[in-house]
């Protein structure tokens, strides 16, 4: 009985040591809420987010949104400036917007890299990753096309995937952003069944 108790105690200590030896890392998902640049892209339907469009989306509004995004992401890093190792985002127009985010003064020290693919979504809205290559060693990435058999002509955002290692351990990340409920829950349900 005494040997069993000692063995159980040692096993518990070993388990606790393994758990406490692991470094916690921050992984974040953030919906950028229609973060478009101000340039009209003839390949997508982004007219709403241009200086001439109904939202009058100009460089002043863009800079304000960029500053707000920088603040939110930096606040996640906290006082200790422990930047998230992976930030998955949705509702971003293109790589250029992501490059502006990681170049902001408060985010630049994180030395982020980008994993992004243009999706077939009509407005050009994508999902993407920003990651720290000093911690996450990227081995690969790929988009997964989202298809809805009952709506073959419906084009939506891809699912973005990336894989690699953290401290030699394999990790796989996915970020997805399903179609909205525009038109009501029942009317839009088939678009979210992918």
Model features per residue range: what roles?
Residues 6-9, 50-54, 82-83, 111, ...:
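Generic alpha-helix detector with strongest preference for long hydrophobic helices that associate
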Residues 8-17:
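Bacterial N-terminal signal peptides
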